[in-house]
Amino acid sequence: MEEIQRYLQLDRSQQHDFLYPLIFQEYIYAFAHDRGFGRSILSENPGYDKKSSLLIVKRLITRMYQQNHFIGSTNDSNQNPFLGRNKNLYYQIISEGFAFIVEIPFSLRLISSREGKNKKIVKSQNLRSIHSIFPFLEDNFSHLNFVLDILIPYPVHVEVLVQTLRYWVKDASSLHLVRFFLNEYCNWNSLILPKKASFSCSKINQRLFLFLYNSHVCEYESIFVFLRNQSSHLLSTSSGVLLERIYFYGKIECLVNVFVKVKDFQANLWLVKEPCMHYVRYQRKSILASKGTFLLIKKWKCYLMTFWQWHFLLWFQPRRIYINQLSNHFLEFLGYLSNVRMNPAVVRSQILENSFLMNNSIKKFDTLVPISPLIASLAKAKFCNVLGHPISKPVRADLSDSNIIDRFGHICRNLSHYHSGSFKKKSLYRIKYILRLSCARTLARKHKSTVRAFLKRLGSDLLEEFLMSEEDVLSLTFPKASSTLRGGYKSRIWYLDIIYINDLANYK
């Protein structure tokens, strides 16, 4: 961000209030391309052999505002560079550039907040990991009783996102451009349903839409910032730039008259002291847990739903919010099934000559691998059938043996790595077995042989690569500490290098 500041050579107030002129600067699109993920979109379009230039952007914006834009016959579309396949490309150029530009005020706000504190903030990459939420849940959720399981709805209209952006970006021209762009050239249903999106929306506006959606989510989550008395349990250093992360909110010590300044609830909303309230979110899934009674959590549900609906136009349906008790209900979050169970323990005590036994029950937070949804994901990916029986992958039969083994091994290691925090490994071993047999069946199909004959001929060592357990990996990485760490393998391991959910574990 510092490089961008030096390159723009603009005052911070000018950057915040006048973003529209930056759309016509060529280096903006170079920055957007360099910060993008994967290959450039320009190299994926065979019909585009020129760099994005100021002239192209000016022509596109001018034609966007024309009354009869992009209306022509089929014959003209072959000659008009703004029709057909190139039209999608130019839309993508504009959306990438604008998504990069509109993030500037948020990045500057984050930088100014750091400078205002006049202290050095330690950057920790571990806070980016989605697995860092589970140690937090282990420490806090075992003492809680009820949880609100919330599925965040999408905004009802694209105008809601633009209106939210108005509070952050004061440039009317930029807001008008993004409103016109989204309304004219994108289907709102395609934006909120990526699986059904067309090329022009699914591939062009992912970054722009995620930015707008996350800004909207941060607005309605601001109520929790208003409620808390203490600082966050863990501070996400990247929350200011609105990237998709988990939000950590700490303990609320005194929660009295929380909505006293909110006009709609000033007369009738008074809450008793609630010593423990926690909120976490990942993508559309959010959890609000409390130590209070069922009546209190039910009031929270009513108050929050009403507040969000009237002030942020988030229309929650009753089936989107569940009130569950942690002791007898499994919570599905980030590809895990979590709950709080009572762990009995017998303690022998002795006082002088008398001894006696005491039975104690300790609450423990458990995380398990949901075997049925995971098998359904494997069946959808054609690794097995719906019953969990391994099948071959004909698509990969044309690859070399080593390539087939590497691909299956990569999938197996990723799943094992992601689900390493499971308390019981039996389900994980079954998944490894399915992938192992699927790889063997694929190799046997390629060589026109049976699985048993193939393994007998080549030996079982062929598949050991992707069957390596987490214990073996850590023992190779830390040979001196392998004996010390080996005792922890039987419980759970949380890896803080995982920043997104595994595709096979993302049950949708």
Swiss-Prot record:
One of its GO terms (cellular component) is chloroplast. The keyword Chloroplast applies. The keyword tRNA processing applies. It is found in: Plastid, Chloroplast. Keywords: Chloroplast, mRNA processing, Plastid, RNA-binding, tRNA processing. InterPro entries: Domain_X, Maturase_MatK, Maturase_MatK_N. One of its GO terms (biological process) is mRNA processing. GO terms for molecular function: RNA binding. Usually encoded in the trnK tRNA gene intron. Probably assists in splicing its own and other chloroplast group II introns. Belongs to the intron maturase 2 family. MatK subfamily. HAMAP family: MatK. This is Maturase K.
